[in-house]
Amino acid sequence: MKHRAFRSIILAIVALLSIVPAVYPRQEKKPKPITPITIEMAEPAQKIMGLNFDRAKLDSVLENLVEQLESFEKIRSISLPNNIPPAILFNPIPVGFQFERVKKPFKMSPPGKVVRAKNIEDLAFYSVGQLAELIRTRTVTSEQLTVMYLNRLKKYGPKLECVVTLTEDLALRQAKQADKEIAKGKYRGPLHGIPFGVKDLLSVKGYKTTWGSVPYKDQVIDEDATVVKRLENAGAVLMAKLTMGELAMGDVWFGGKTRNPWNYKQGSSGSSAGAASATAAGLVGFSIGTETLGSIVSPSTRCGTTGLRPTYGRVSRTGAMALSWSMDKIGPICRTVEDCALVFNAIQGADGVDQTLYEAPFNYDPKVDWKKLRVGYLKMEFDSVRSNKAISDSVLTVLRKLGAQLIPIELPKLPLDGLRIILSAEAAAAFDELTRSGKDDLMVRQMKGAWPNSFRSSRFIPAVEYIEANRVRYLLIQEMQKLMKDIDVYVAPSFGGSNLLLTNLTGHPCVVLPDGFTKEGTPTSISFIGQLFGEAKLLAVAKQFQDATDYHLKHPKLQE
């Protein structure tokens, strides 16, 4: 224990002193000379880390501190773009856990008879499954849908502030190509010809990838993200790069504040702000968002969309902005649960580049045998709901009517708030160059809770404490597995207790979907959590709940 504390003070003090000198440009190749370190410098520095070594012990570490600082300068002389990951890879799989290995045919619900509306704009809120059937039967063309959605993006996008870049030329080319292929009998599947948008942290060749931030608003990354490539291979049509909260926080970006289509006075929440807003407003067939800590769940709740946050290690982040290498996840934001299944089926799987990915089958089947299904619910969180409690209680009523035998459960009791430093430290590393160059001063939000201050504050997190937090995270993963081995899926208030933070740390998948409306007329949501790599069963259960309600069929009145 003494040795660990000794190492902690070394790294803690060096972490502090490393930010005292003037800002060093990342491009500098020659390390700067190191300022001598004295006890007078080290003594107050240790207090910030909660340490209390006497002067004799501090004196004995001074030489080591200088050597460490020299090492830091050598590292800082190397340019590390955002897309370079750390060599340490996060593993969400608990000891003894086994996921399904056998791949089975993907099954979707029969489309039934889908009638084309007389006015093509009335198709704007159709599900992906419905649009796919119209395209497959050549009742409507991809080009017709694409033009309709492009017109809506131009008409409603400015007021919602949900679009960064229209990829109009690309979209029209892709739509025409889709129509040609389908006319020749080369139908690629249910996403063929479907127009969509992506959160503007996914790179698209030939277009800006702004990350929602002033310092990057003219950035062009000359590659297509893996998710973009896979959707293109599925025949989908990319129409727009959609807004995101600056560097994946909130709904404020360099061009404004993305709006909730149900209430324009509200922001859409974030950080997948434009993806949720545009999908809810019927400006795209579906969209792609990301989540590190609530960025699919929160805007989907605010805007009334259905979102899937997949298991960590399911969807490639290649070509996506990194915020937290051990917590970032990419998933669809749609109008229905089954739409999420269709999109997820196209984007999941290893790509040979993102080394955190696992090859696990996605055996989706919408049928559910409630007699064999073990469904848990967070009893304490449901009992503690204050606002909109009747809505939350109605979720349990619906599930019981469907045949679910609900099992009350409790989440593991560990100091989760302390683990937030994992995200803070990784985010600070991902944007180290931005901070040390001083360009973080260009960012829109500069209050204490915004990224610039968070990045600076996180330089005071000792490396030892970051590692210790991840050791506690390991315990959390094992404890969560003890809970999940007895249930298949559990339901939770989307913002009830520690569930959102906990499951983002453990990597468990989540489906968030509307479950009602407030008295002000804005959507509310409920979340379903599944086994690691258990998206198939999770989506099937969530679909059963959604089919028993009609909240997803209601749409906002838009302002021009």
Role assignments for model-derived ranges:
Residues 10-19:
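Bacterial N-terminal signal peptides
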Residues 55, 61-293, 311, 397:
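Gly/Ser-rich catalytic/binding loops embedded in alpha/beta enzyme cores
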Residues 223-347, 493, 504, 508-527:
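Short glycine/serine-rich loop segments
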